[in-house]
């Protein structure tokens, strides 16, 4: 067998904490439950456990450091290898210590806080009430200016008959006979001894024998509540407002849950949102685009905005009106109003209009259509022989 320090991949001067951490990591990696039927993993697991058994014991480690593992022959658990998996598993369980140091075996097997095993569920400590979610629609204009909305929500509140105790009298609350008031029971599963919430009292440690008739022993009843929600200017769809303490009542003196308000901004008939900017498509005639004009455009700040459209303006041109967009919801600056030009091609022309357009077309020259001229020049260049 290789050197014990090499097996655990630690330095010879490693601290007990470093040795324990290294062992835990490797032991979980090669644990038989994670590697069923893998003989090599089983062998590695025994070697790792033997190395830890020696290096975690101060006296054995001193002997090993001075004289090697041969000097440990005959010592319990050291020097002669773990002949059975039971010995290795006992070392494994001892290393995790059932919660010593704030860690649990479930943290290493991917169980997080052990809740799926019942290790930390329940309990009699203060617990926060459940949080709630509501969706609220606001108009485009309300999102620009901000608005106050009234909501009606249903939350669990303390029963005003039993004051949240759940019992009609103090004599109606008894210590749980199953867990003797601990709120937890122990269960042995193979090599593992697990702590679970008591199934009789659900981790409370007490049972109610004389339940309150108003709340049916729950200690809380559902109540409707009218609340006012301030929607700040600049909100957008998908944003969330948190209202602390507007969820269900807490248990055992714990704080109430929170209310999360999810915003949905309704679309507008003529405006669109682009970040904090507001986009407006402005239709103008062919003549207005060619000759230029002045236009008054609407805004959501109730202020008339005038823009000057110069002659020769092309379709899709955007004019920017500063400060007429959405305010930043965090309070820093405002977006702009973007006016995008849409040049309409005339339809349903009269004979006279057609004649005039035909006459105009005959008078057009390359200088009137610079983009087309440039395009035709590129086409000629493309097809011309070298």
From Swiss-Prot:
CXXCXGXG motif repeats: 159-166, 176-183, 198-205, 212-219
Annotated cofactor note: Binds 2 Zn(2+) ions per monomer.
Cofactor(s) this protein requires: Zn(2+)
Binding annotation for Zn(2+) 2: 176, 179, 198, 201
Domain J residue range list: 3-68
Signal sequence segment: none
GO biological process entries: chaperone cofactor-dependent protein refolding; DNA replication; protein refolding; response to heat
Molecular functions (GO terms): ATP binding; heat shock protein binding; unfolded protein binding; zinc ion binding
Disulphide-bridged cysteine pairs: none
Domain remark text: The J domain is necessary and sufficient to stimulate DnaK ATPase activity. Zinc center 1 plays an important role in the autonomous, DnaK-independent chaperone activity of DnaJ. Zinc center 2 is essential for interaction with DnaK and for DnaJ activity.
Family note: Belongs to the DnaJ family.
Protein name per the record: Chaperone protein DnaJ
Protein species of origin: Protochlamydia amoebophila (strain UWE25)
